[in-house]
């Protein structure tokens, strides 16, 4: 009797063990035997850091973020200056950069406290990719004597862009009544970031002067801009390039970013492509279609 009972228990234990093993396999592979996809693990996390006085970046970039989540399988978070876009000294939530796979900056003349700068510094030193729009060339504006003044050169260190507005690099633009004709640089025509981007298009952004000192010689220039109706003698200047910064991170920056630029399909595709490239993902071959973006310049008037 004891022998039969022992045999039964052994068979039951074996069956339970097999059931547990099958349960474990199904957890990892799914009932159909194919690998189960972890929705959190597979989705890149893109954090947008916004705060500018002029170009409504806190309104345009959330629309890009929504498109990434809806059609491109990404997770996003948009951080904004407080109490509003004019707030220069507080962008809550920067600790999100610790989990980010890509940090996207659209900043202008911020004076963040050191504890917030530390999150950006930590991110840069991780060697993860960075992306910047327009006024990020002069993201910070600390006065002489401030221990944080070195941050005024953020764009130079992170993107190979001029270290702030004016200065020795004579970083300027060609007037608020000008616009820009943009063309693909022939040598860059096969760059994946330019997949599906029209060979020429027009944007509302007045052209930024970055040459002759920037971008660095080891940058890859993608798009060239020509000022239309400039207020001074103008030279053609690159308006988008990539670079490997000193921390080993991929960098993409564009000096475009006027809210009307976001209505231009070529610009939209440039941005989506660049985000994929930054993350080391294949650039989408199938464009999901033009985004409906209609954000005013200068921020909406408050009621």
Which ranges hold each PLM region?
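Non-transmembrane alpha-helical segments in soluble domains
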Residues: 9, 65, 121, 194, ...
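C-terminal segment of N-terminal export signals and the immediately downstream linker at the start
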Residues: 22-46
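Extracellular ligand-binding/catalytic regions of CAZymes and related secreted enzymes
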Residues: 38-44, 70-71, 228-303
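Catalytic beta-strand/loop cores that center a nucleophilic Ser/Cys/Thr
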Residues: 69, 75-77, 85-88, 99, ...
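N-terminal secretory signal peptides and thylakoid transit peptides that target proteins
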Residues: 1-19
């Amino acid at each position: 009797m004891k022998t039969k009972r022992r045999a039964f228990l052994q068979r039951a234990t074996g069956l339970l063990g097999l059931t547990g093993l099958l349960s474990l396999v199904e957890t990892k592979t799914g009932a159909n035997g194919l690998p189960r996809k972890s929705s959190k693990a597979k989705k890149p996390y893109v954090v947008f850091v916004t705060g500018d006085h002029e170009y409504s970046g806190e309104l345009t970039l959330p629309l890009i973020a929504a498109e990434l989540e809806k059609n491109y399988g990404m997770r996003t978070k948009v951080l904004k200056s407080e109490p509003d876009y004019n707030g220069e000294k507080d962008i809550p939530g920067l600790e999100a950069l610790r989990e980010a796979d890509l940090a996207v900056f659209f900043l202008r003349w911020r004076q963040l406290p050191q504890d917030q700068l530390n999150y950006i510094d930590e991110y840069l030193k991780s060697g993860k990719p960075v992306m910047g729009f327009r006024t990020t060339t002069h993201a910070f504006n600390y006065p002489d004597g401030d221990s944080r003044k070195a941050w005024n050169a953020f764009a130079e260190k992170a993107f190979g862009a001029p270290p702030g507005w004016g200065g020795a690099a004579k970083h300027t633009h060609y007037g608020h009544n000008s616009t820009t004709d943009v063309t693909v640089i022939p040598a860059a025509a096969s760059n994946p970031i330019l997949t599906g981007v029209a060979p020429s298009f027009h944007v509302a952004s007045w052209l930024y002067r970055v040459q002759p000192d920037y971008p660095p010689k080891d940058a890859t220039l993608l798009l060239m801009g020509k000022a239309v109706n400039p207020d001074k003698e103008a030279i053609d200047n690159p308006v988008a390039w990539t670079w490997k910064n000193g921390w080993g991170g991929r960098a993409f920056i564009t000096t475009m970013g006027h809210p009307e630029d976001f209505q231009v399909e070529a610009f939209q595709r440039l941005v989506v492509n660049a985000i994929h490239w930054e993350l080391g993902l294949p650039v989408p071959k199938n464009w999901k279609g033009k985004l409906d973006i209609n954000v005013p310049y200068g921020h909406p008037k408050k009621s």
